[in-house]
Amino acid sequence: MMNIVENQTVVRRAPDNAGEERVLAARPEAIGFTPQQTALIVVDMQNAYASQGGYLDLAGFDVSATAPVIANIKVAIAAARAAGIKVIFFQNGWDNQYVEAGGRARPTSINPMRLKTMRKRPELMGKLLAKGDWDYDLVDELQPQPGDIVLPKPRYSGFFNTQLDSLLRSYGIHHLVFTGIATNVCVESTLRDGFFLEYFGVVLEDATHQAGPEFAQKAAIYNIETFFGWVSSVSHFCDAVGYKTEQNAA
């Protein structure tokens, strides 16, 4: 449940942007942004992470509560597009031989649950998180449109070995609004790396879902709002950009 304090201090990148500024209610304080300098980041909304029969489900994680998250992300995407905010989708995975995943003498080949799952169930090799397979595909409800950007990523962070930073700088973007799965893994990893690169990161709490128990979501949200960024909600995001839904019009 969001607990946003009204009439709070507003964090601004530069005072001279006030003419175009929108203000997003958030924790620990409201944050000002301009749509042209903001991107909505949709992290790994693939069947692997959000659907029954996908990688997380097969690995023993509960994905039964992802439907409302998908619906909320769909609203956030519509609001972003209507406001002229760039929408960037990430897809995590590799080729079906996992050559792009790298060699075996590395921690990222030993520790990740996805590779452990495939070692336990070799029949899944070439299917889990493999480009061109259903598991890698974005869920049907969240499909890119012309003008959106789709970036593959080989690791948890969307900044590592991708075009993200150079694309954001070329568009003059410095505010990032995060949605997706998993809050405590790829969402938090990308937001943290963005913070280190001087991006303002906001996570829409009700448009994310954790991998693991509920405390993993709470811990990730605590880390973000305390150390690395801001936390808001889809309804507050819609309010900030002037996008009307049945919920926020009531």
UniProtKB/Swiss-Prot annotation:
Enzyme class, UniProt record, top EC level: hydrolase
Query: Which EC number applies?
Result: 3.5.1.110
The keyword Hydrolase is assigned to this record: yes
**Tagged with keyword Hydrolase:** yes
**Active site residues according to the UniProt entry:** D44 (proton acceptor), K153, C186 (nucleophile)
**Coiled coil segments of this chain:** none
Q: Which SUPFAM superfamilies does the entry mention?
A: Isochorismatase-like hydrolases (SSF52499)
Q: Which InterPro entries match?
A: Isochorismatase-like_dom, Isochorismatase-like_hydrls, Isochorismatase-like_sf, RutB
Which Gene Ontology biological process is one annotated for this entry?
A: uracil catabolic process
| Pfam families in alphabetical order | Isochorismatase
Tell me which domain of life the UniProt entry assigns to the organism this sequence originates from: Bacteria
This protein's UniProt keywords: Hydrolase
Q: Which GO terms describe its molecular function?
A: hydrolase activity, acting on carbon-nitrogen (but not peptide) bonds, in linear amides
Catalysed transformations (reactions): (Z)-3-ureidoacrylate + H2O + H(+) = (Z)-3-aminoacrylate + NH4(+) + CO2; (Z)-3-ureidoacrylate + H2O = (Z)-3-aminoacrylate + carbamate + H(+); (Z)-2-methylureidoacrylate + H2O + H(+) = (Z)-2-methylaminoacrylate + NH4(+) + CO2
Q: Show the PANTHER family listed in the entry.
A: ISOCHORISMATASE-LIKE DOMAIN-CONTAINING PROTEIN, PEROXYUREIDOACRYLATE/UREIDOACRYLATE AMIDOHYDROLASE-RELATED
Q: What does this protein do?
A: Hydrolyzes ureidoacrylate to form aminoacrylate and carbamate. The carbamate hydrolyzes spontaneously, thereby releasing one of the nitrogen atoms of the pyrimidine ring as ammonia and one of its carbon atoms as CO2.
**NCBIfam families per record:** RutB
Q: To which protein family does this belong?
A: Belongs to the isochorismatase family. RutB subfamily.
This chain belongs to which protein, by name?
A: Ureidoacrylate amidohydrolase RutB
What is the species of this protein? Pantoea ananatis (strain LMG 20103)
Identify the coding gene: rutB
